[in-house]
From Swiss-Prot:
Keyword Hydrolase: yes
The species this protein was found in: Ruthia magnifica subsp. Calyptogena magnifica
Alphabetized SUPFAM superfamilies for the sequence: all-alpha NTP pyrophosphatases
Protein name, UniProt field: Phosphoribosyl-ATP pyrophosphatase
Pfam families per record: PRA-PH
Family: Belongs to the PRA-PH family.
InterPro entries linked to this entry: HisE, PRib-ATP_PPHydrolase-like
Amino acid sequence: MNDILIKLEQVLEQRKSAKVDESYISSLYNKGTDEILKKIAEESAEVIMAAKDGVNDKIIYEVADLWFHTLVLLRFKEIKVNQITNELSRRFGLSGLQEKAKRNN
């Protein structure tokens, strides 16, 4: 799974230098954080609607869109995929209550 995320990360990085009128991603970068966040909110709502519909293929499709636009945000903010996977690894094996208690200290 990590391989496709790394490949996407590389493409998203390349799109930073693409012409705005030739790249959807470049146009999002050009519009800034608020526009990227609007797309993430839109995709999140679509995941919720797909889940309520109960059709797994729709859920998969919409989650892929959500992950993609989240990756756009990460690249825009100069956050690498491995930083997220490292954080997930750090949390692995901790109960949710343990992880929350660590944040409150």
